[in-house]
Amino acid sequence: MGEVKKLSLGGWVFYLRGEESCLDRHKCGKWMHFFNNKEFAVHICEEAVSNGICVEAKHADADEGVCCFYLNSDDIEGHKRVLSYFIENDLIRKTKTGKLYNISFKLDDQTRAGEYGTEFHSEIKLEHFVDLNTGEFL
């Protein structure tokens, strides 16, 4: 377990390990989890960074909101670590039939460009790594 620095800034709480410089401005993005329990958000963000799942995470500084787990888009092993963590901790919602929702990885460039809702299209999705029916890695 690595030491984690916690920083509150602009409505967000960041969790950092001092390795953020490896994140490339145009390749960096995040897998997201929407929460309604701030204590849980604190726990999963801190744990993910401390255990090397990702080098940076953040959550909204509110009782509900979003957690973001950061990595570079071309870091295939990093995607697998984060998604494995999501699956192990039941962070991906399921449909009524038990199938995992096909969540998306969002580049920070897309966020900076204001791509939200129907304007947002991801090239990296859960289905590229995991069978949505079984939750097993491909």
Residue ranges and their predicted role:
Residues M1-L138:
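Structured alpha/beta or helical-core interaction and ligand-binding surfaces enriched in interleaved
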